[in-house]
Structure formats: C-alpha cells, structure tokens
From Swiss-Prot:
Occurrences of domain OmpA-like (ranges): 115-243
Protein role: With TolR probably plays a role in maintaining the position of the peptidoglycan cell wall in the periplasm. Acts as a porin with low permeability that allows slow penetration of small solutes; an internal gate slows down solute passage.
Quaternary structure note: Monomer and homodimer.
A Gene Ontology molecular function term of the record: porin activity
Transmembrane region(s): 1-8, 13-21, 48-57, 62-69, 88-96
Family: Belongs to the outer membrane OOP (TC 1.B.6) superfamily. OmpA family.
Official protein name in the record: Outer membrane protein A
GO CC annotation: cell outer membrane; pore complex
Repeat positions for Sequence: 104-105, 106-107, 108-109, 110-111, 112-113
Domain notes from UniProt: The extracellular loops are most variable in sequence, and in some bacteria confer sensitivity to phage and/or colicins.
Chain positions covered by the region annotation 5 X 2 AA tandem repeats of A-P: 104-113
Principal location class: membrane
Keywords tagged on the record: Cell outer membrane, Disulfide bond, Ion transport, Membrane, Porin, Repeat, Transmembrane, Transmembrane beta strand, Transport
Length: 243
C-alpha cells in the first residue's frame, strides 16, 4: 500500500514517487543431510516500499508508465533463513476511471436591467404667459438647458414623458385642455432640438396632483395672493426613463 505523489514536467508527462509499505509472506523449505529431513517455515510482515517513475498520458483514460520499485528487508533470517531486498523495473499501461469531460456549470443569469427614472420640473409661469400654451422666450431658454441635460444622459432604449399641470382656478375642462396644449408645446420644442419623436410623448394632467393646499381658493375668481400661492401647481414635469 503506497501513496503516489505526481508532478507535471510537460503536457501529459508526469514524474512521480510512491511511498508506503508492502505486506509480504515468505516460505522456506530445505532438506538436511543424509537423513533427508525436510524442514519448512514461513513468516509474514510489512516492509518499507519506495518507487519512482514517469507516466505519460496517451489519452484522457489511458496512460503508460516506467516504474522502478524498491522494497527493503523481506523476510526474517531467524524464520525463513534470509532477509533480502527486492527491486523491480517495470513498464506498463493503466486505465483511469472517471475521466469524463468536466461539464462547466451554467453561467448565472444576467441581472435584470435597472430602469432609472429622472424627473425634471419646470414652472409654467416661466414657460408660458397666463392661460396660454405658446412658449415665451424665457421658456425656450429653460428648455434649451433641459435639452442639454437630456442629451448628456443618452438613455439606452429610454423614453420621455412630458406632463402638463394647472392650478384649480377655472373650469376643469378648460384646465385639462390647457395642460394638454402646454405639454404638447414642450414636446414639439424638444423634438425640434433633436429628441426623437418616437421617444417622447405628451400628457395633460389638468388639476391632478396638486402640490400645495387650496391656498383659501374655493371657486370663481382667485385673488392675486391666491394665484401666487397656487403657482407651484402650474408646472410641467419631464419624466425620463432609461436603462
């Protein structure tokens, strides 16, 4: 029984050593003198074993080897009459079981892309005159700055949604129509600057999603103070989604 230690020195070529022990049984028989007396004896034991060799892989299963083995002190002079050493030089072939190709594990699935959403809010009082949907020069300048930011983002397979909002002053239907017209004006301007038309859309939200309280306004005409208080509700939001 021996342990084998190998070291590669070239492709498919290893040198190795084996160290261990060999269990042996020795038998002896002898005839003595004129009487013809026959004597026999036997002994068993374990002797140290050492070997060195080279092994060449012919295929992934078959290999050939040249091996030199030395076993020390086999037997006992007191029982079998001798205690020789044993050496052996051998050339052989071997077959290795379990050498099938290793199947690499399937790669882990790629993580799902993270959809990032950014929101830009512009005041309608900067973009438009009161109750109008045409952009003011100041509004165009604000959109020019926004376009620069959108261009630097360069979203992959992204989309832009422009949402128009009004305050609650006036009739619901009129506010809805105004919010749609203002959102469309912003979309048209950004498309003229270079945003692909199939990547941007407009949506009028009317009086939805107010960001302030009523500021004391109930219905009818609003006071100047109420109009100023309700200003944050008059806005255009640009929602940018990209991967």
């Amino acid at each position: 029984l021996a342990a084998k230690l190998s070291y590669p020195i070239a492709d498919d070529l290893d040198i190795y050593t084996r160290l261990g022990g060999m269990i042996w049984r020795a038998d002896s028989k002898a005839n003595y003198g004129r009487t013809g007396e026959r004597l026999s004896n036997h002994d068993t034991g374990v002797s140290p074993l050492a070997a060195v060799g080279v092994e060449y892989a012919l295929t992934k299963n078959w290999a050939t080897r040249l091996d030199y083995q030395f076993v020390s002190n086999i037997g006992d002079a007191g029982t079998v009459g001798a205690r020789p050493d044993n050496t052996m030089l051998s050339l052989g072939v071997s077959y290795r079981f379990g050498q099938d190709d290793v199947v690499a594990p399937a790669p882990a699935p790629a993580p799902a892309p993270v959809v990032e959403t950014k929101l830009f809010t512009l005041k309608s009082d900067v973009l438009f005159n009161s109750a109008k949907s045409s952009l003011k020069p100041e509004g165009q300048q604000a959109l020019d700055q926004l376009y620069t930011q959108l261009s630097s983002m360069d979203p992959k397979d992204g989309s832009v949604v422009v949402l128009g909002y009004t305050d609650p002053v006036g009739k619901d239907a009129a506010n809805q129509k105004l919010s749609e017209a203002r959102a469309r004006s912003v979309v048209d301007y950004l498309v003229s600057k270079g945003i692909p038309a199939d990547k941007i859309s407009a949506r009028g939200m009317g009086e939805a999603d107010q960001v302030t309280d009523s500021c004391g306004y109930k219905n009818g005409r609003a006071t100047k103070a109420q109009i100023e208080c309700l200003a944050p509700n008059r806005r255009v939001e640009i929602e940018v989604k990209g991967i």
